[in-house]
Regions:
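Short, low-complexity N-terminal intrinsically disordered segments enriched in polar/charged residues
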Residues: 1-37, 113
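A solvent-exposed, acidic/Ser-Thr-rich amphipathic alpha-helical stretch
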Residues: 27, 31-94
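Short beta-strand edge/turn micro-motifs at domain boundaries
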Residues: 99, 117-145
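Flexible loop/coil segments at beta-strand boundaries within sensory signal-transduction domains
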Residues: 92-94, 111, 129-132
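Short, solvent-exposed loop/turn segments at secondary-structure junctions
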Residues: 49, 107-109, 145
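Short beta-strand segments enriched in hydrophobic/aromatic residues
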Residues: 34-35, 42, 104-106, 140-143
């Protein structure tokens, strides 16, 4: 199998691993996906396509801080549904990086019945580490298209 196809399959599997981690509410599995230098900018709303308004909710990847944040979410919310669909995967000619465009429709409900709906399209950027492992290095917040 050619290197680019292997990379495409590895990135597809990374998306599926992330989906399974959200489904299982497994914070350890989620943080295992991230590169140590990962960043995750968020638009204030799914309609804010202009990056000049974007923010960082959790800062640069910090395993402990991100784990605690997701554990708090899982402790206070019930996952109603988590639907994800890969729209496109692009791999570099060198097969050392790529991105996946993923449509997300995830609904959480807290103990008071308040919903938190994650809905939109994300660009998830991956890099192949020197040991061959793939890591998520950048992820945009969800945008409506």
């Amino acid at each position: 199998m050619e290197r680019k196809e292997q990379a495409r399959q590895a990135i597809e599997e990374m998306v599926h691993r992330e989906t399974r981690a959200w489904d299982a509410q497994d914070a350890a599995a989620l943080v295992a996906l991230f590169h140590p230098d990962a960043v995750w900018p968020w638009p204030p709303t799914e309609r804010d396509h202009d990056p000049t308004s974007w923010i960082f909710v959790m800062g640069r990847f910090d395993r402990d801080r991100w784990t605690r944040s997701w554990q708090q979410l899982f402790a206070t919310h019930r996952l109603v549904h988590n639907r994800r669909a890969i729209q496109k995967i692009v791999v570099t000619d060198e097969a050392d990086g790529g991105f996946a465009v993923v449509d997300v429709d995830t609904l959480w409900r807290d103990g008071q019945g308040q919903d938190s709906h994650w809905h939109g399209r994300a660009c998830k950027v991956y890099t192949r580490m020197s040991d061959g492992e793939w890591k998520l290095i950048m992820h945009t917040g969800l945008l409506a298209y």
